[in-house]
Regions:
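A detector of single, family-specific signature residues
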Residues: 1-261
Length: 261
């Protein structure tokens, strides 16, 4: 992100600037120097041929960073859950075959007991709550394993890391909610769309902002910007098969796509 420090300085001095995709301003092949490149860019600017990339204001950029960082922590937490499952499998403990979430309250109590040295399947199954109590026999069979001191240490470290990630995610949730409070009506409208959860609504607002009309003349422009429009390539009267633009992260202003599964 070489453009960010410069943009921050220019923005602080209230100087108008353009961030332009380098692929859109390539000069004619030949002798290439920094001076010639500068002259070429100046000529393009004088003739109005520079197409600026969309650079949100500082508030929205900060909002994007918060939402993206939260997303990365959530993904890391999921990876840590998978590591816990791998440790359990290595200890021949098949907890996931009985419970749908090994990080639910009952399962977490069982894991904590394992960390503290508990190995008796009946005792571990006794931590089951509510509907899980009906699966006590299955739990006892699934919890018959052999956990070494090494695996116990690994499990303890992973659970500690998960707790830390949970705390950080909650803190980010609070900050995101505070910053988006003035746009609650927009969030509610997005949340009313089938398939869009509150977290997704927050991400959409953070990425495209609320002043969409000033940036995108139509819905088609917005769809193209996020990479949902097939490309159209034609040469000598022949059309190549359409391909959707690959959606990437818009932390790069020249690769301004953000919708990911």
């Amino acid at each position: 992100m070489f453009w960010k420090p410069i943009v921050n300085l220019l923005e602080a001095e209230d100087i108008e600037f353009l961030v332009v995709n380098a692929q859109h301003i390539k000069a004619v092949p030949g002798r290439k120097t920094d001076v010639k490149d500068a002259e070429w860019i100046c000529n393009l600017l004088r003739h109005g041929l520079l197409k600026p990339s969309y650079i949100p204001d500082r508030n929205q950029r900060e909002m994007r960073e918060l939402v993206r960082y939260r997303r990365s922590l959530i993904q890391e937490r999921s990876r840590e859950h998978n590591r816990v499952q791998k440790v359990l499998e290595g200890a021949n403990i098949k907890l996931a075959s009985v419970v749908s979430d090994i990080m639910a309250l009952s399962s977490r109590d069982m894991l904590e007991a394992m960390v503290h040295g508990e190995t008796d399947p009946e005792t571990l199954a006794g931590f089951a709550r509510r509907s899980m109590k009906r699966k006590k026999e299955e739990l006892e069979l699934a919890l018959k394993g052999t956990m070494s001191s090494h695996q116990r240490m690994m499990l303890k470290t992973m659970l500690t890391h998960i707790d830390f990630l949970n705390e950080q995610i909650i803190e980010l949730d609070m900050e995101v909610a505070k910053r988006l409070a003035p746009f609650q009506k927009d969030l509610d409208r997005l949340d009313s769309i089938s398939g869009i959860a509150p977290g997704t609504a927050e991400q959409i607002l953070a990425e495209i902002g609320t002043d969409i009309a000033s940036r995108f003349p139509s819905a088609a422009h917005l769809c193209s910007w996020v990479g949902l429009v097939p490309s159209h390539n034609e040469s000598a009267g022949k059309r190549s098969p359409p391909k959707h633009v690959k959606a990437t992260n818009i932390s790069d202003p020249h690769s301004s796509k953000f919708l990911t599964p």
